[in-house]
Amino acid sequence: MAPNIRKSHPLLKMVNNSLIDLPTPSNISTWWNFGSLLGICLTMQILTGLLLATHYTADTTLAFSSVAHTCRDVQYGWLIRNLHANGASFFFICIYLHIGRGFYYGSYLYKETWNTGVILLLTLMATAFVGYVLPWGQMSFWGATVITNLFSAIPYIGQTLVEWAWGGFSVDNPTLTRFFALHFLLPFAIAGLTLIHLTFLHESGSNNPLGIVSNCDKIPFHPYFSLKDILGLTLLLLPLTTLALFSPNLLGDPENFTPANPLVTPPHIKPEWYFLFAYAILRSIPNKLGGVLALAASVLILFLCPLLHKSKQRTMAFRPLSQLLFWTLTANLLILTWVGSQPVEHPFIIIGQLASLTYFFTLLILFPIAGALENKLLNY
């Protein structure tokens, strides 16, 4: 009998073992769709980004007008740009839901997979930040100025580091050029890290909603989950195309329709919606270095999840106390996102400070206590 090329060819064999014959737990829910959706988001962002890069000029005098030219004069340039800008928002929606699912179902106990995932999140955040600077509008320029300036809070080397990042004494042409280079490079780094992430995942196999070993009941990925993922894809593309075609600027800042002007500061400098929770935590601390440390901690705290797991059960499916805390944390993040979009005045300052405190308190103290308490209640 002739060998099946899918199983014998050195390259196809790898694809087969990852996407076709991959043994998958039979009970994984729709929450497990977001991994493949993130892969599709990345592919789409790289393709649309590549097409945009062919028409973009990384120069302070030309960047703004080159983006306008893309939207006005290039065939479907407006569509490519709208898909790219809003695709970033959907990328973050998917990654936040993906992390939330991992947190709820205890997927962080696969430490290598979880840690590479957190590194992926950090790389994605860096990519989105440098990308937001490229259109060289007012919010692009001032966002770049404010966020890069945070590095000056680092003792002793801070100021040198900032000027090195800027390539001068302020955000100017060298900054834009290097940000474009980074924005082009980082998505490919994300693609490479994704392969590492998947390699670690396929070492252990997927987790499942019950959090139990599922070796006794696994089914092939294709056709069951490939079809399920296509359904997820259509449900992602529908709101994305709706947003890109009907209201492409809904999530953007009107300030970015004004070309960058170093002499005029916008009344409210704020990042895109997906960074607002971290921005609110940064602003809630009056000290500059303290704010920067809290900002870094708000994301780096994810690395501690495996260490803070005290429950004998893996998932939160049968842990009502932890469930309550999980949804409190979700509401807390939504409050932080809202506060981050508001001006720095009463009552938003105190709300932001309380929400920031609750965020860290819940993750670092309440979750481990709840896990230990649930063990005790179940006589473990």
From Swiss-Prot:
<keyword id="KW-0999">Mitochondrion inner membrane</keyword>
<keyword id="KW-0679">Respiratory chain</keyword>
<feature type="transmembrane region" description="Helical">
    <location>
        <begin position="348"/>
        <end position="368"/>
    </location>
</feature>
<keyword id="KW-0812">Transmembrane</keyword>
<keyword id="KW-0472">Membrane</keyword>
<dbReference type="InterPro" id="IPR030689">
    <property type="entry name" value="Cytochrome_b"/>
</dbReference>
<dbReference type="Pfam" id="PF00033">
    <property type="entry name" value="Cytochrome_B"/>
</dbReference>
<keyword id="KW-0479">Metal-binding</keyword>
<feature type="binding site">
    <location>
        <position position="202"/>
    </location>
    <ligand>
        <name>a ubiquinone</name>
    </ligand>
</feature>
<keyword id="KW-0496">Mitochondrion</keyword>
<feature type="transmembrane region" description="Helical">
    <location>
        <begin position="34"/>
        <end position="54"/>
    </location>
</feature>
<feature type="binding site" description="axial binding residue">
    <location>
        <position position="183"/>
    </location>
    <ligand>
        <name>heme b b562</name>
    </ligand>
</feature>
<feature type="transmembrane region" description="Helical">
    <location>
        <begin position="78"/>
        <end position="99"/>
    </location>
</feature>
<feature type="binding site" description="axial binding residue">
    <location>
        <position position="197"/>
    </location>
    <ligand>
        <name>heme b b566</name>
    </ligand>
</feature>
<comment type="subunit">
    <text>The cytochrome bc1 complex contains 11 subunits: 3 respiratory subunits (MT-CYB, CYC1 and UQCRFS1), 2 core proteins (UQCRC1 and UQCRC2) and 6 low-molecular weight proteins (UQCRH/QCR6, UQCRB/QCR7, UQCRQ/QCR8, UQCR10/QCR9, UQCR11/QCR10 and a cleavage product of UQCRFS1). This cytochrome bc1 complex then forms a dimer.</text>
</comment>
<dbReference type="GO" id="GO:0006122">
    <property type="term" value="P:mitochondrial electron transport, ubiquinol to cytochrome c"/>
</dbReference>
<feature type="transmembrane region" description="Helical">
    <location>
        <begin position="114"/>
        <end position="134"/>
    </location>
</feature>
<dbReference type="InterPro" id="IPR036150">
    <property type="entry name" value="Cyt_b/b6_C_sf"/>
</dbReference>
<dbReference type="Pfam" id="PF00032">
    <property type="entry name" value="Cytochrom_B_C"/>
</dbReference>
<comment type="function">
    <text>Component of the ubiquinol-cytochrome c reductase complex (complex III or cytochrome b-c1 complex) that is part of the mitochondrial respiratory chain. The b-c1 complex mediates electron transfer from ubiquinol to cytochrome c. Contributes to the generation of a proton gradient across the mitochondrial membrane that is then used for ATP synthesis.</text>
</comment>
<keyword id="KW-0813">Transport</keyword>
<protein>
    <recommendedName>
        <fullName>Cytochrome b</fullName>
    </recommendedName>
</protein>
<feature type="binding site" description="axial binding residue">
    <location>
        <position position="98"/>
    </location>
    <ligand>
        <name>heme b b566</name>
    </ligand>
</feature>
<keyword id="KW-1133">Transmembrane helix</keyword>
<keyword id="KW-0830">Ubiquinone</keyword>
<feature type="transmembrane region" description="Helical">
    <location>
        <begin position="289"/>
        <end position="309"/>
    </location>
</feature>
<dbReference type="InterPro" id="IPR048260">
    <property type="entry name" value="Cytochrome_b_C_euk/bac"/>
</dbReference>
<dbReference type="InterPro" id="IPR048259">
    <property type="entry name" value="Cytochrome_b_N_euk/bac"/>
</dbReference>
<keyword id="KW-0408">Iron</keyword>
<feature type="transmembrane region" description="Helical">
    <location>
        <begin position="179"/>
        <end position="199"/>
    </location>
</feature>
<dbReference type="InterPro" id="IPR027387">
    <property type="entry name" value="Cytb/b6-like_sf"/>
</dbReference>
<feature type="transmembrane region" description="Helical">
    <location>
        <begin position="227"/>
        <end position="247"/>
    </location>
</feature>
<dbReference type="GO" id="GO:0005743">
    <property type="term" value="C:mitochondrial inner membrane"/>
</dbReference>
<dbReference type="InterPro" id="IPR005797">
    <property type="entry name" value="Cyt_b/b6_N"/>
</dbReference>
<keyword id="KW-0249">Electron transport</keyword>
<dbReference type="GO" id="GO:0046872">
    <property type="term" value="F:metal ion binding"/>
</dbReference>
<dbReference type="InterPro" id="IPR005798">
    <property type="entry name" value="Cyt_b/b6_C"/>
</dbReference>
<dbReference type="GO" id="GO:0045275">
    <property type="term" value="C:respiratory chain complex III"/>
</dbReference>
<feature type="binding site" description="axial binding residue">
    <location>
        <position position="84"/>
    </location>
    <ligand>
        <name>heme b b562</name>
    </ligand>
</feature>
<feature type="transmembrane region" description="Helical">
    <location>
        <begin position="321"/>
        <end position="341"/>
    </location>
</feature>
<keyword id="KW-0349">Heme</keyword>
<comment type="similarity">
    <text>Belongs to the cytochrome b family.</text>
</comment>
